[in-house]
């Protein structure tokens, strides 16, 4: 089956993406550049796989994703013999949330003093920075680091803007620190998950049923948008566009 035919049959439904992803994985398409993608996450992320595979194929890549065991970050990064490196990734995605990395910043923010908030931000920055550095010690893979979406519910509610250190500001400061970490490491980039969620809307992003079933913080439409956006980042990082300038020196063009 031709790739064009496979992609043409994708109608936007999760089932059509799943079928197309399977056919792409089983087929041989010379026009697609192979890319192994390793994913480290603190939440259930593998449902994004079919969307990532199909949207990457639209952009000329045959992505083979590997999803590390749930919430295993350091275990995969620091062990050079881990399944992550055995998969020989060209791209490593670190998909984490503050809910898992720094629960106090989300769950009990109003009980924290300003120094506590600064400490939590520093701890997250140090941990993610350590992951990026650890990957670089064992691999030359491109690293994409998810930044953090605003919390769906502010601990102080309407009073958040009146806090000396607001929860909104704390999340943004954490994202700023992640950006600094990525700037300091060659081949590391921020995946702007926060913007993706904000543009789509918090209430539309999550499906409570999926969260309670399997700690999946994204509904099916959010999974599609994440897979599509990730494919764009991977394409830009691994195969940057080239520009050609044609100069007419003898009036023959």
Features from the language model and the residues they span:
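Extended, charged helical/alpha-beta scaffold domains that provide interaction surfaces
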Residues: 38-45, 49
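Short N-terminal or domain-adjacent regulatory/targeting segments
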Residues: 1-31
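Asp-based phosphoryl-transfer active-site loop
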Residues: 243-253
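Alpha-helical cap/lid subdomain in secreted, periplasmic
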Residues: 2, 25-35, 49-54, 58-221, ...
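Generic low-polarity alpha-helical segments
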Residues: 1-3, 37, 251
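Short hydrophobic segments within beta-strands
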Residues: 39-40, 146, 248
């Amino acid at each position: 089956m031709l790739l064009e035919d496979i992609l043409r049959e994708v109608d936007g439904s999760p089932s059509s993406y799943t079928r197309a992803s399977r056919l792409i994985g089983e087929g041989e398409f010379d026009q697609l550049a192979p890319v192994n993608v390793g994913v480290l996450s603190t939440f259930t992320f593998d449902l994004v796989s079919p969307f990532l595979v199909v949207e990457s194929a639209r952009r000329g890549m045959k992505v083979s994703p590997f999803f590390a065991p749930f919430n295993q970050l350091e275990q995969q990064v620091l062990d050079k013999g881990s399944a992550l490196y055995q998969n020989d990734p060209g791209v490593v995605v670190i998909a984490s949330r503050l809910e898992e990395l720094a629960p106090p910043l989300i769950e009990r923010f109003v009980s924290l003093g300003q120094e506590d908030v600064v400490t939590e931000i520093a701890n997250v920055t140090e941990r993610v920075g350590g992951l990026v550095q650890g990957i670089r010690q064992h691999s030359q893979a491109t690293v994409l680091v998810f930044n953090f979406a605003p919390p769906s519910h502010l601990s102080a509610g309407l009073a958040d803007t009146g806090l000396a250190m607001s929860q909104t500001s704390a999340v943004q400061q954490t994202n700023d620190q992640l950006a600094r970490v990525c700037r300091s490491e060659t081949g590391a980039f921020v995946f702007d998950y926060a913007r993706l969620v904000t543009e789509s809307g918090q209430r539309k992003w999550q499906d409570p049923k999926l969260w309670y079933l399997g700690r999946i913080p994204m509904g099916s439409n959010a999974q599609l948008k994440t897979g599509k956006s990730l494919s764009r980042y991977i394409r830009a990082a691994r195969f940057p566009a080239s520009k050609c300038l044609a100069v007419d020196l003898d009036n023959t063009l």
